């Protein structure tokens, strides 16, 4: 997929998605396409701040980038929150994945009975008229070992509720039935499409 790619069927419904992660774009691309919405991928790094909550991080990033591109856009950030670790790594998920990796998280949970966790995505939509946040959450548990070769990030160790497979063992379509990212984007779409009808 190129740095700027579109999907969907209605040329009047096009949204700029800011991310340097192609996997995230692919997930949202599939959801948008199924709703007849066009997504344009702006492949640039986010302007991030160190903060203790995802809402503050994405709001800052979205506003900062909007001031440059001056087009309606979405910025998203996601975190893995492990209950036995008091919500760690949370908003520091990307940093922890790079430093500890999947094995590092599994070692932290070695011998821990409570493996419950959740993924949370927060999306910020910015236009010349508004700034809105949309959230998606999926509950589940951390697996005992790394499983699956699909997906990205912590997908190989996260099993959503009512499933036995990790996200990394699912296709994008299967993952989107549970995905925190898909839920957040659908929440945005419901708002966006209802606003266009008024």
Write out the residue ranges for each language-model feature:
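Anionic-ligand binding patches
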Residues: 7-16, 23-198
